[in-house]
C-alpha cells in the first residue's frame, strides 16, 4: 500500500475524467488533468463546465470514485484510502441529483394510503394526448376514510369521491391511479376494484367523480393497483394471494362470480342501502399464484402483456398476461412488500423490490440472468412498502418506508457488498441513499426509529410536480428540487 500523502502547499493530483453520458464526452486530450489536491465536488464541476473543457454552462456534476460519490476533497479521499499523491484517480462524472426540498402538504381526515399525479408528462397525461391540457395538473389521493380526493397543484380539493351509500368504497382504500385524464381506478379493503369517471372543472367550476364500474373477484383486501391506459387494463394484487387482470371497460368485462358480490349474503334491507346502481363485473384473469398475501403487481414498462408480482411468500413472479400464467419464478430471502419496474435500454426491466428486512433488492427477472440479485439498497430502518422509479432516467428511484422517511437512490453509486449485506448474503453490490427526507409534520418532534405516527404508505415521482408521498400523518407531502430529475 502507498504511504498516505502529506499536506503540501500547492499539492496536485492527476485525475482522469470519464463518463457514460454520450452527450457529455470530453475529447481524449482533455481527459487527464492536474488539479489541486484540496479540490472538492464543486470545484471539479466548475472545471468541467469551463470554456476549455465541456463548455456546458452550469450543469451540476457529481463524481464517482471506485463506485462511490466523492463527498470530501481529493486529498481527504486519498488519505482515507491510504493512497499517495502520485495516485492517478479516475473520476466518473455524472449529472447531479439535486436534493428535493419540502414544498407543501395537503391535510386529510385519515391515513393516506396512495397518491398519484396527472401532468403532461405523467403516464396518464401522456396516454390522454390532446385531451389533457397544461394547467390541469392534478393530484389523486386515497385514504383510509374510504374516500378519493382530487387536488390541484395549489392544494385545493376539487372533488371528493362519493361515500359507500352513493357508490363509493365501503372500507379503506388501499390504492388509486389515473388511467387517463378522465378515468380513475381504485382498490380497497372491501375486496373491490372500482372505476370512476372524472370530470374536470369547466366553466362552471364544478368537478365530478362518478363511479362507473365495480369489479369483483378477489376474496380479501386488494392492496396494489397498476394501470395501462391505452389498453384500459388494470392489474391488482390481493391479500388472498391472487393477482388479477381487469378491464376498465364494462363491455369487455365478463360477469362476476355472484357469490363474491357484496349483496350475495346480505339482507334485502342492506341491499338497497346504496342509492346508486353501478354495473358489476369480474376479472379477465384471476391467478391464484402466491402462498401468502400478494403485495404488489406491475406491468412491464415496455410490454403490457407481461407483468410482475411479489408476495410475502418471498417470491417474484413473471406473468404472461395474455394467458394468465406464470412464466418465471424467483425466490428471495424475505417477505416482499413493494415493487417497481425500472426500464432498461434493452430487454427486461430491473425490478426494485421492497422487503420486510428494511432493504430494497434489485432483481433481474430474465430467466437467463446469471445472478438473480443485482444490487441491495440499504438505509431504511423499517419495512419498505412503497417504490417509484425516476420518470426521466434509468438509474434512480425513491422509496417510502414505515420508518417515516423517503429515500432517493442513485444506482450509479455502488460498492462491493461485505459479509451479509447483499441479498442471500453472498457477493453482489450495495448502494446507500443519496438523499433522505422525513415527514414535515414530524419536524421538531421526537423521532421514533420505527416511524410511529409518520409511516409512509405510498409514493410517486412526477417530472413536473416532484415527489408526492402519503402516510400515517394524514397528509400528502410534496417535495421538489430544481432539476432533481434532470436527465
Curated annotation (Swiss-Prot):
Q: Repeat WD: residue ranges? A: 122-161, 168-206, 217-256, 379-419, 451-487
The GO molecular function terms of this record are:
ribonucleoprotein complex binding
User: Which family does the record claim for this protein?
Assistant: Belongs to the WD repeat WDR12/YTM1 family.
Q: According to the UniProt record, where is the region Ubiquitin-like (UBL) domain?
A: 13-95
Full protein name? Ribosome biogenesis protein YTM1
Write the gene name: YTM1
Under the heading SMART domains, the entry gives: WD40 (SM00320)
Would you say which domain of life the source belongs to?
Answer: Eukaryota
Pfam families per the UniProt record, alphabetical: NLE, WD40
Amino acid at each position: 500500500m502507498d504511504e498516505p500523502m502529506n499536506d503540501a502547499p500547492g499539492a496536485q493530483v492527476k485525475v482522469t475524467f470519464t463518463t457514460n453520458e454520450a452527450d457529455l464526452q470530453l475529447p481524449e486530450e482533455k481527459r487527464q488533468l492536474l488539479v489541486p489536491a484540496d479540490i472538492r465536488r464543486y470545484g471539479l464541476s466548475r472545471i468541467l463546465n469551463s470554456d476549455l473543457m465541456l463548455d456546458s454552462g452550469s450543469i451540476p456534476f457529481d463524481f464517482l470514485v471506485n463506485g462511490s460519490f466523492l463527498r470530501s476533497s481529493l486529498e481527504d479521499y486519498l488519505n482515507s484510502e491510504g493512497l499517495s499523491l502520485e495516485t492517478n484517480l479516475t473520476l466518473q462524472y455524472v449529472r447531479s441529483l439535486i436534493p428535493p426540498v419540502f414544498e407543501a402538504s395537503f391535510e386529510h381526515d385519515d391515513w393516506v394510503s396512495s397518491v398519484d399525479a396527472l401532468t403532461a408528462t405523467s403516464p396518464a397525461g401522456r396516454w390522454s394526448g390532446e385531451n389533457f391540457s397544461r394547467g390541469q395538473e392534478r393530484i389523486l389521493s386515497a385514504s383510509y376514510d374510504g374516500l378519493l380526493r382530487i387536488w390541484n397543484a395549489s392544494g385545493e380539493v376539487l372533488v371528493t369521491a362519493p361515500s359507500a351509500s352513493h357508490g363509493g368504497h365501503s372500507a379503506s382504500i388501499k390504492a388509486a391511479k389515473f388511467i387517463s385524464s378522465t378515468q380513475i381506478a381504485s382498490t380497497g379493503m372491501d375486496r373491490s376494484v372500482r372505476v370512476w369517471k372524472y370530470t374536470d372543472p369547466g366553466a362552471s367550476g364544478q368537478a365530478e367523480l362518478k363511479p362507473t364500474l365495480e369489479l369483483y373477484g378477489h376474496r380479501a383486501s386488494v392492496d396494489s393497483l397498476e394501470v395501462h391506459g391505452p389498453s384500459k387494463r388494470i392489474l391488482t394484487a390481493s391479500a388472498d394471494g391472487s393477482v388479477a387482470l381487469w378491464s376498465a371497460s364494462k363491455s369487455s368485462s365478463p360477469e362476476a362470480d355472484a357469490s363474491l358480490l357484496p349483496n350475495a349474503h346480505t339482507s334485502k334491507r342492506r341491499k338497497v342501502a346504496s342509492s346508486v346502481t353501478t354495473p358489476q363485473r369480474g376479472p379477465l384473469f384471476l391467478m391464484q399464484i402466491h402462498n401468502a398475501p400478494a403485495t404488489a403487481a406491475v406491468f412491464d414498462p415496455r410490454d403490457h402483456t407481461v407483468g410482475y408480482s411479489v408476495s410475502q411468500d418471498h417470491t417474484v413472479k413473471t406473468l404472461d398476461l395474455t394467458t394468465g400464467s406464470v412464466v418465471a419464478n424467483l425466490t428471495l430471502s424475505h417477505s416482499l412488500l413493494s415493487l417497481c419496474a425500472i426500464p432498461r435500454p434493452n430487454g427486461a426491466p430491473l425490478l426494485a423490490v421492497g422487503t420486510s428486512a428494511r432493504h430494497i433488492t434489485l432483481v433481474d427477472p430474465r430467466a437467463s440472468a446469471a445472478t438473480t440479485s443485482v444490487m441491495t439498497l440499504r438505509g431504511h430502518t423499517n419495512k419498505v412498502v412503497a417504490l417509484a422509479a425516476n420518470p426521466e432516467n434509468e438509474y434512480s428511484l425513491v422509496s417510502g418506508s414505515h420508518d417515516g422517511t423517503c429515500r432517493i437512490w442513485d444506482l450509479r453509486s455502488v460498492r462491493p457488498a461485505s459479509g451479509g449485506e447483499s441479498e442471500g448474503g453472498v457477493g453482489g453490490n450495495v448502494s446507500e441513499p443519496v438523499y433522505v427526507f422525513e415527514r414535515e409534520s414530524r419536524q421538531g418532534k421526537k423521532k421514533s426509529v420505527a416511524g410511529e405516527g409518520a409511516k409512509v404508505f405510498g409514493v410517486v415521482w412526477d417530472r413536473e410536480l416532484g415527489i408526492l408521498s402519503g402516510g400515517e400523518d394524514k397528509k400528502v407531502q410534496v417535495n421538489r428540487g430544481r432539476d432533481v430529475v434532470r436527465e
